[in-house]
Amino acid sequence: MRQLIAGNWKMNGLRSTSESLLQALRDAAPHALRNCDMLICPPATLIAQAASVLAGSGIEVGAQDCHMARSGAHTGDLSAEMLVEAGAHWVILGHSERRRDHGELSETVREKVIAARQFGLTPIVCVGETEDERASGRETEIVGWQIKGSLPDGFAADSNGVIAYEPVWAIGTGRTATVEDVAMMHAFIREELVRQFGEAGRGVRILYGGSVKPENAASLLRVPEVGGALVGGASLSAQDFLAIAEASA
């Protein structure tokens, strides 16, 4: 299975400043997509622009969250249907920053996954432990709970779901998990997916996310069971994001 290099722009980018980045990605797509799949998840305000610029390039566009309801009194939220209409085909769900900043529980993430798939969005479900949880030796316990709570029945049935392992202590800190840490956690996640979904669990891509950059991408992407990368800050630079994609070769 081809690796997936996904860029999470987080709360960064304006229409006026994103055009050149999107154009650079579009221009590089024929070369960049030789060995991997690529995806960017800009802020919701930029989804339509990104979808327009990248149309036909092979680089896909996603969102950073969606609400579980189709419509209603949910001020500030966006439904999966709205995101699809804007041009999204993917959605990040359960990112540690949403779990932290918005108090999202795994049960909420599960409902969002169900809603996303109803409208054709492919979910990237994030799991990962904090520094305190790792220090106390509970990293597999925490991630196991998150997998069980966040993934609905049938998540792996059509190999259309993606997991992103993001050690919370490595996100935006410049710290990166060691290759040994990544190998251990990705092997554990694969075991949990097979335990929960049977052989279908072997078809789920497991991305690594946590300060991925050109300097460490090759070593991380060579780790067994690493099916790609969820890239944060480095995805805001076309040069860096494309270098990470090149490392997947």
From Swiss-Prot:
Pathway: Carbohydrate biosynthesis; gluconeogenesis; Carbohydrate degradation; glycolysis; D-glyceraldehyde 3-phosphate from glycerone phosphate: step 1/1. GO terms for biological process: gluconeogenesis; glyceraldehyde-3-phosphate biosynthetic process; glycerol catabolic process; glycolytic process. It comes from the Bacteria. Its main location: cytoplasm. GO terms for molecular function: triose-phosphate isomerase activity. The active site is at 95 (electrophile), 166 (proton acceptor). PROSITE patterns: TIM_1, TIM_2. It catalyses: D-glyceraldehyde 3-phosphate = dihydroxyacetone phosphate. It is found in: Cytoplasm. InterPro entries: Aldolase_TIM, TIM_sf, TrioseP_Isoase_bac/euk, Triosephosphate_isomerase, Triosephosphate_isomerase_AS. It is an enzyme of class 5 (isomerase). Substrate binds at residues 8-10, 172, 211, 232-233. Its EC number is 5.3.1.1. One of its GO terms (cellular component) is cytosol. Keywords: Cytoplasm, Gluconeogenesis, Glycolysis, Isomerase. Involved in the gluconeogenesis. Catalyzes stereospecifically the conversion of dihydroxyacetone phosphate (DHAP) to D-glyceraldehyde-3-phosphate (G3P). Homodimer. Belongs to the triosephosphate isomerase family. HAMAP family: TIM_B (MF_00147_B). This is Triosephosphate isomerase.
